Amino acid sequence: MTHPQTIALVESLDHEGRGVAHVDGKTLFIDGALPYEKVIYSSYRKKPSYENAQTSAVLKESFMRADPRCPHFGVCGGCSMQHVEFTAQVAIKQRVLEDNLKRIGKVKAERVLTPIAGPAWHYRHRARLSARMVAKKGGVLVGFHEKSSSYIAEMRECHILPKHISDLIMPLREMIATLSISQRMPQVEVAVGDKLDILVFRNMDDITDADFAILKAFSDKHGAAERPLQIWLQPKGPDTCYPIYPLDAPKLTYSMPEFAVEMPYYPTEFTQVNPQINAVMVARALKFLDPQPGERIADMFCGIGNFTLPIARSGAVVHGMEGSQPLVRRAVENATHNGLQDKVSYEMANLFDVTEESFAALGKFDKMLVDPPRDGAVQLLKAITEETAPQRIVYVSCNPSTLARDAGVLVHTKGYTLKAAGIINMFPHTAHVESVAWFEKTGPCKTRKEVEEIEALEAAEREAAKAARLAEENAEKARKAAELAEKAAAKEARRAHYFAEKARRDAEEAASDQ
């Protein structure tokens, strides 16, 4: 389908890395466009107040524009910002964080931190690749999904995966095609550890002896004695995965030498995808937390102990809480593995359902580290009272909008000051923003009545903004309806004029004939 093309001047980037422009009162989100560029765009989704569009041509380039390294960029959904110069990516993400803090949380950090950034390429040590037999493509495809699509990108290489893993994409495509269950193996999970690599194949049917021989040969060919390539199968959910070859491989681990910590983990368990940046992130978080011997510190959403164990190395006593029982078990094992079992304790808890009473029951914490998923930790932070408030909170975030919301709760209702905040470029060439923020208790908590008044005011502001948007949309609809009515009236006038003229000419011709 051919879409109409128009010119726009791009003003900024949104949180997904799309160019933002305004044309005829509408907000445009334009894939592939950068701030200060003049582009020809083609709209592919239209709503009353906004449109989604694709860049067709760049008439005036931004100083931020770079040539994408990957030949699949623009089709593959694995990256969205390879067309942006690397240092500009970092600056854009920092601006996204600051804008969210100001707009959503109505807060400003006393200090903006220098961004944490590392290697631009080959950083991703965990990935979930899709696999599918596609007859039209002549075989099996292995890779990330295409942008905004369920189709798998036809990939031959990937510049964000480690080079030796990228080199496996084509051999994987060829090998899977030879399996008896090639059409029943929809996913390959990749895990790159300190001493080995693991491929977890999601097998929806049992493999045959011949399939096992093929997988074994693949491991032998592409692994090495000093760095094995271990094959795992996953017949159902993530907890069902198990190794099949080689069985004498070392454990899958990542390390943080600065804290003398080694973390064993399963390939399907959550860990940070960028181990270099993870180590720097942990170091920065602990610098702000400043754990001291004898302090009691909480690690909320602790996972397998990524922050818990480095904190415990300081001599502090750490209590980790996590909503997944398998991750809690792994965290306990990792504490023992590192000889820190006497310094840490863990429990499973739903941290999205914390109350003032349940938080108080945990006892007083001197400090707290929070590392929630994208939904944030608003319920946990609302449960803090004057009696239970930690003196310091370090918040590690994977979503700047929920961090901003939660920062608003801490600053405006719990008596905290946002001392510092900055971004962590955990995912180069994507719009994903990780960040860290340091809060210090400097004032009293608001009373419950005061909090209710603040929440009521915020709710009223949201409703007013919603009503304003609705009124704007209705006004736009009315304007368009008026335009259509005007066009229809003009068309009808032209039609009436045509027939009137025709009738006049017919009458003149009839008179002339007489």
Swiss-Prot record:
Signal peptide segment: none
Family: Belongs to the class I-like SAM-binding methyltransferase superfamily. RNA M5U methyltransferase family. RlmD subfamily.
Keyword check for Acetylation: no
The UniProt record lists the keyword Transferase: yes
Reaction(s) this enzyme catalyzes, per UniProt: uridine(1939) in 23S rRNA + S-adenosyl-L-methionine = 5-methyluridine(1939) in 23S rRNA + S-adenosyl-L-homocysteine + H(+)
Superkingdom: Bacteria
Gene3D superfamilies: 2.40.50.1070, Nucleic acid-binding proteins, Vaccinia Virus protein VP39
Active site feature: 398 (nucleophile)
EC number: 2.1.1.190
Origin species: Chromobacterium violaceum (strain ATCC 12472 / DSM 30191 / JCM 1249 / CCUG 213 / NBRC 12614 / NCIMB 9131 / NCTC 9757 / MK)
The protein's name: 23S rRNA (uracil(1939)-C(5))-methyltransferase RlmD
Function: Catalyzes the formation of 5-methyl-uridine at position 1939 (m5U1939) in 23S rRNA.
Keywords: 4Fe-4S, Iron, Iron-sulfur, Metal-binding, Methyltransferase, rRNA processing, S-adenosyl-L-methionine, Transferase
Residues that, per the record, bind [4Fe-4S] cluster: 70, 76, 79, 158
Molecular function terms, GO-annotated: 4 iron, 4 sulfur cluster binding; iron ion binding; RNA binding; rRNA (uridine-C5-)-methyltransferase activity
Gene Ontology BP terms: rRNA base methylation
InterPro entries, alphabetized: 23S_rRNA_MeTrfase_RlmD, MeTrfase_TrmA_AS, MeTrfase_TrmA_CS, NA-bd_OB-fold, SAM-dependent_MTases_sf, U5_MeTrfase_fam
Binding site for S-adenosyl-L-methionine: 272, 301, 306, 322, 350, 371
